[in-house]
């Protein structure tokens, strides 16, 4: 497991927040948000704990804006303590947390006209390519980082950043955290590349399973939606002037507050008794919008920047047999799993719950108070962080 730095060789300073963009081999640009504990050390700091966070459908990396710093603080304390004071004489493990925006979400680019906009395995692919770029997960490959800017807390100072050269097999293991759809991606990725991961944390999610008998009807529905909507989204595709989905027809909101209100209203229409705090909604909406008129600085109108194709039915889905196989593969790979659900979260059926218990067999299984975004809401993120920290500490024991 990870070696812990002694208090004499490291001193906690503050959280460093970094924004980076990576160019994938197919031209898609992935935007990422990084949090790390800023420390001073005289020893080799390459043995860094690595945590990769995957967000949910139509969310973005800002959904981890509260959980990531909370994890850093409590992991730096070496316990699940909720004490807000960072003491100088404690053992500190250098930790980096990275959350990506999936293609079509947040600040990442959209897929091309001919690219599948929403396939779970596609998201797993982009997470794998990001891991290569970070040189994590015992993976020596590299990718091209387009740009990088570093800020300390709320400072405006910015500087160029480079990818760390991490060495040591055990130090390169990743703790994978997924929320909702991101949990499904995390399960698929962990099942495919178990050697990369030391732990798997699933927040309010898992893999969605459909009956194999519905496959042809599902493909028909997806094809009809794509045929109908492509003509609107890509009217000039045949003359070569339209290469990606456009926001020119996106709904315009008078200002950021109106967009936040719309996001909150969407949550109210979701299944169950879901709620979303204003603070969490604002974090995600700020990252998910752009000015409606870039040439008019006085106009506060905004539009959502996400790829509208994300709201189409996917051309493919997993059957129950496949879902069970993915979860079984994670379990037999001996990657420990933490599964946390919310009391007022997304409703799940009895079959999924039984598969999680029987096939995945999490070593840490709890239901917490809160709603579907309990990791993003200020009132519930602390409890989520404590459970995740307890799980991570168990990995190191």
Q: Where do the model's predicted regions map?
A:
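Catalytic histidine-centered segment of alpha/beta-hydrolase-like enzymes
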Residues: 371-381
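Conserved alpha/beta-hydrolase catalytic His-Asp/Glu region
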Residues: 239-320
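Conserved HGGG/HGGXW glycine-rich cap/lid loop of the alpha/beta-hydrolase fold
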Residues: 33, 38-40, 44-110
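N-terminal cap/lid segment of alpha/beta-hydrolase-fold proteins
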Residues: 8-29
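Active-site loop/oxyanion-hole signature of alpha/beta-hydrolase fold enzymes
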Residues: 25-26, 33, 38-39, 90-177, ...
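Flexible "cap/lid" loop of the alpha/beta hydrolase fold
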Residues: 188-191, 198-255
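Conserved serine/cysteine hydrolase catalytic core
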Residues: 290-358
């Amino acid at each position: 497991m990870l070696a812990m730095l002694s208090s004499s060789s490291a001193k906690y300073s503050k959280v460093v927040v970094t924004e980076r963009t990576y160019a994938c081999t197919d031209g898609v640009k992935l935007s990422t948000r990084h949090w790390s504990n800023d420390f001073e050390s005289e020893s080799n700091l390459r043995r860094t704990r690595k945590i990769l966070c995957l967000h949910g459908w139509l969310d973005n990396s800002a959904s981890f804006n509260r959980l990531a710093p909370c994890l850093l603080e409590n992991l730096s304390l070496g316990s699940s303590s909720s004490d807000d004071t960072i003491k100088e004489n404690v053992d500190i493990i250098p930790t980096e947390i990275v959350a990506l925006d999936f293609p079509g979400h947040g600040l990442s680019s959209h897929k091309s006209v001919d690219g599948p906009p929403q396939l779970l395995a596609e998201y797993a692919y982009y997470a794998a390519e990001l891991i290569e770029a970070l040189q994590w997960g015992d993976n020596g490959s590299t990718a091209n980082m387009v740009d990088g800017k570093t800020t300390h807390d709320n400072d405006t100072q910015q500087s160029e950043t480079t990818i760390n050269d991490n060495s040591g097999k055990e130090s390169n293991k990743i703790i994978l955290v997924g929320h909702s759809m991101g949990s499904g991606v995390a399960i698929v990725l962990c099942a495919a590349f178990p050697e990369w991961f030391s732990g798997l944390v699933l927040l309010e999610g898992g893999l969605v399973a459909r009956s194999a008998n519905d496959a042809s009807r599902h493909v028909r529905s997806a094809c009809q939606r794509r045929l109908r909507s492509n003509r609107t989204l890509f009217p000039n595709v045949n003359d070569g002037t339209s290469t990606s989905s456009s926001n020119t027809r996106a709904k315009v909101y008078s200002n950021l507050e109106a967009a936040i209100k719309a996001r909150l209203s969407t949550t109210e229409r979701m299944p169950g008794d879901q709620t979303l705090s204003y603070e969490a909604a604002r974090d995600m909406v700020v990252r998910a919008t752009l000015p409606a008129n870039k040439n008019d600085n006085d106009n506060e109108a905004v539009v959502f920047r996400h790829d509208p194709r994300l709201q189409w039915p996917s051309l493919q889905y997993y059957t129950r047999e496949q879902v069970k196989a993915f979860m079984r593969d994670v379990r037999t790979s001996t990657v420990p799993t933490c599964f946390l659900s919310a009391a007022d979260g997304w409703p799940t059926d009895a079959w999924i719950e039984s598969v999680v218990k029987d096939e995945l067999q999490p070593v840490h299984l709890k239901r917490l108070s809160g709603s579907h975004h309990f990791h993003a809401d200020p009132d519930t993120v602390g409890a989520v962080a404590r459970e995740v920290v307890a799980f991570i500490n168990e990995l190191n024991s």
